[in-house]
Amino acid sequence: MPAQLTDWHDTSARQAIELTEYFLANFSVDVSRVYAAGYSAGGETMSQAVSMRPDLYAAYLHGASQWDGDYAPIAENGTAVYIFMAEHDEYYGSQRAWSAYNSLHDAYEEAGWSEEQISNVLQIQTPNDEWFAQRGVTSNYHGGGNVVFGEDDVLNWVLSHTKEENES
């Protein structure tokens, strides 16, 4: 269930958390299999929400966005993160994805995770123009990045994680 942005800051992040909590309280939900995804501005918000309450989420798909949340809480709670950004994203640029990846990797190391454990819970993909062309996207790589939500390997990776499994 998508939340609509009120802002790109704490207000929307807290509303996303409240929506998650509402579903957990009012529907039959496997609490070990709660997932989040954020794309573009929604990724800025969801990176904040997931870092504010990483205990709620087994995995998070961070698409075509910059990371505005904290890093340490993600690692401390073992939340799996898949970062996806076009190599030539016109809006954010792929360097922001790599910066988030490196900061999350450092946070996992500081939390005592081994390299093998980290590789199981942290992934990044920054596909090139040819990868997008094979999927019918030949320009506007930022907007075209939404093809990630149709990539079975990415979605299966996210859905393969459970809260108990991720805890080190």
PLM regions and their residue ranges:
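C-terminal catalytic histidine-bearing segment of alpha/beta-hydrolase fold enzymes
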Residues: F84, E90, E109-S168
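Gly/Ser-rich "nucleophile elbow"/oxyanion-hole loop immediately N-terminal to the catalytic nucleophile
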Residues: L5-S40
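Alpha-helical scaffolding within the catalytic cores
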Residues: E18-L19, E44, A64-I74
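Alpha/beta-hydrolase-fold catalytic nucleophile elbow
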Residues: A37, H62-A64, F84
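Short, proline-enriched alpha-helix->beta-strand connector loops that line the catalytic pocket
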Residues: A75-V81
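Short alpha-helix in the alpha/beta-hydrolase fold that links the catalytic acid
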Residues: Y92-E110
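Short glycine-enriched nucleophile-adjacent loop
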Residues: G43-P54
